[in-house]
Amino acid sequence: MSRWFPSVQAIRSTKLETFVQVGLAATLVLNVWVNPAVAADPFRTKEARNIGDKTEAAFKAIFQQGDYKAAEAYLQQALVSEPNEPLAYAMKASLAYTNKDWTTLDTYSKKTLEMGQKLIASDPLRGNIYTAVGHFLEGAALVRRQGTVNGATQALSKLQEVYKYLDKAEAISPNDPELNLLKGYMDLMLAVNLPFANPQQAIERLDKNAGPEYLADRGIAYGYR
């Protein structure tokens, strides 16, 4: 994994800030509600997971209707009726980042990590995926609290944890569309924002195994820009 992590001195502060911002945007993009016919799972046509009605409604409010106020209301309900769904907490954290609400970002990044870790026992694939997402969001919160330069070392440590858990998920189901979409996007964000990195491997991952197809294609297009 060391090939993903150049020295802190090699990272330009503006690049790291860009990575955090684009990566959080990617976290939102990857959770788009795509196909209502697929058991609340926009990624899989086999072994689909249910994420809960309120979380689903929040997806629709954000990505179909652009109604963030309604989405916040649905997410508040989801935290009560679907308290073990880490995606609800991840969306709360991502919306907090969008709203520059750093206290809420800090709170829900920690909850995303906690719920992801809890999910590992019953769904190791998604549990490891969202444990990785939780570490990513915590890294973003660190950068916001401490600044890009002061928070760089800890943020990179978090990034190592992100890939540790994504690798665990990949060991369980290497061709899983949700995993490959998320990991493909994160690899891509690193490749285009850090020096000496090549986006080709990320592009190939998105092309071969990620789903849904149109989001994979969006990532591929970004990689070729």
Where do the PLM segments sit?
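N-terminal secretory signal peptides that target proteins for export/translocation
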Residues: 1-16
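N-terminal leader/linker segments that initiate helical-solenoid repeat arrays
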Residues: 2-4, 21-24, 28-98, 106
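Intrinsically disordered, low-complexity coil segments
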Residues: 11-13, 117-121, 215-216
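Short coil/linker segments at helix-helix boundaries
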Residues: 41-44, 50-53, 62-69, 92-168, ...
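TPR alpha-solenoid repeat register
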Residues: 88, 127, 179, 212-216, ...
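Aromatic-lined carbohydrate-recognition surfaces of secreted/lumenal glycan-active proteins
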Residues: 182
